[in-house]
Each structure stands twice: as C-alpha cells, then as structure tokens.
Amino acid sequence: ALVMAVVVAFGIPEPMRPEHRQSLKLCSLLRNYRTIAKDISFVGYTLTNALIFSGLFAFLSGSSFVLIDFLGVPTEQFGLYFACMVAGYIVGNLTAVRLGRRLVPDQILVRGLIIAVAGGSLMAVLALSEVFNVWAVILPQALFMIGTGMVLPQTMAGALANFPTMAGSAS
C-alpha cells in the first residue's frame, strides 16, 4: 500500500491543467459542495443511485436468511443462486452499452428503472400472494439486477456531467 501511495503521489502526473485545478482548502471544498448540492440534476441522479443501491443492499443483507433459513437452500448452493444476481447485473451493463449506441443516457436510465421497478414489484406481488419458493425470489431479483446494471453507470455519469472540474467533489 505504501509503494502504491508513493507511485500515485509522485509517479502519475496530474492530468488536469493548472487553471482548472481545485484548491484543497476547506473553504474551497465547502464552496464546491454547496455548488454541487444546489444542482437539481446532480440531486436527482444521486437520489436515483441511492435508491437503487438501497434495493440492492436490502437484498444482499436478507438474501442468505430468506434463501437458506426460510426456503431451505443448502448453504453450498447459495453461491450458485447468488451468481444469478451477478449475471443479471452483467446483462444489464451489456444491455446499457448496446443501447448507448442509439439512445441517450437518460433514455437508458429510464428503461433500467422500469426494469428494476418491475423486478421489485414482481417480488412483492409474489410474496403477498404467498408464493414462497426459490425462483419467486431469484428471478425477480435477477430482473432487478438487470435494471441496476443499466441504471448505475448512467446515474454516476449524469451526476458528474455538469462538474468536470469538480469531479472529485461530485463523486
């Protein structure tokens, strides 16, 4: 870690031109944060990102309990079911890349949100209908993950787009 810190500090040149560099003084940082926080598009993208992440982490924190303890999935098989979530995320990312050739980022974002909401809603409907089996959890969550894979890159890029000289603060 120390070697990497030295390499980064002294071996990688600063890519930003001097006239665009931001000061690390507290007043300058606070001014940047205030500017960023007042931007409605930044707030929208950030809230969208936060909501998608909250759905993701809700699943991550409860999935082992639901699948193993409630639905009886053997612990050695849990990883296989979990791989479906990873596959869904990858499919979403690859779909976003392909759609990026003909759609603007916000159009991809909306499509991803529709897919994610559909997955979450389907899981809720199945649970309320007392459909309790592994696939009633895995398939809707995989659908949610496809949407997540489409949404997250768009929200991050959108949040940073208006602040090219303050990307470190905005991220």
Q: What residues fall within each predicted segment?
A:
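Helix-loop-helix hairpin linking two adjacent transmembrane segments in secondary transporters
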Residues: 1-12, 16, 80
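Helix-to-loop junctions at the C-terminal end of transmembrane segments
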Residues: 91-107
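C-terminal transmembrane helical hairpin of 12-TM major facilitator-type secondary transporters
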Residues: 107-155
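Small-residue hotspots at the loop-to-helix junctions and early N-terminal turns
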Residues: 75-83, 171
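Paired intracellular helix-loop junctions of major facilitator superfamily
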Residues: 157-168
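Pair of pore-lining "gating" transmembrane helices in MFS-fold secondary transporters
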Residues: 38-58, 142-146
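Juxtamembrane intracellular "pre-TM" segments in multi-pass secondary transporters
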Residues: 13-46
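Short amphipathic helix-loop junctions that connect adjacent transmembrane helices
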Residues: 61-77
